[in-house]
Amino acid sequence: MTRKLNKLAAAVALLAASGLAWSVDDTASFSVTASIAAACVVGNTTAMAFGPLAMLDTASGGLSTAKNNATATFDAACTNGTTSPTLKFASANGGGSAFKMLGGSGTDLITYTLYEGATDAGTSIAHDTLAAFTGYSADGTTKSLTVAGKVVAADKNGKPIGAYSDTVTITASFTP
């Protein structure tokens, strides 16, 4: 009888093991999603340094009629397909439509103008106003853009000696 039981136990074990070999796989799936939001950014700015402003003309012995120019660069990018990207430039010392550098006295101001591009031949930039900027597009790549600045003789002559400075804040915007 023990022998029959051993054979029966072996048969049951074999049957159980063979059942595993006949198992059926079960599957499930999951979805994967992502989205890209419309967005624009600016950064990586360089300083605009006019340096010493030429006040006197040694050749004529009078006041200089020369303008002073300087440039600054910044990076800007928008996600591909963002609608109507624009930039706004605001002077910390400006008022109305002007960009202004403030002197050490706290009351002396030198007005300057900003332009799109590397020279004052570009489109002038309105103070604190959103506007399109040449070369700035929503194509998903970073653009290195240049702004030119100009101080004309009338805005610097007669100003007291000292250091003048301003901070320009660039705001990137778009139509959602």
PLM features: residue spans?
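Charged, amphipathic alpha-helical segments and their flanking helix caps
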Residues: 109-110
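Extracellular beta-sheet repeat scaffolds used for adhesion and glycan interaction
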Residues: 118-142
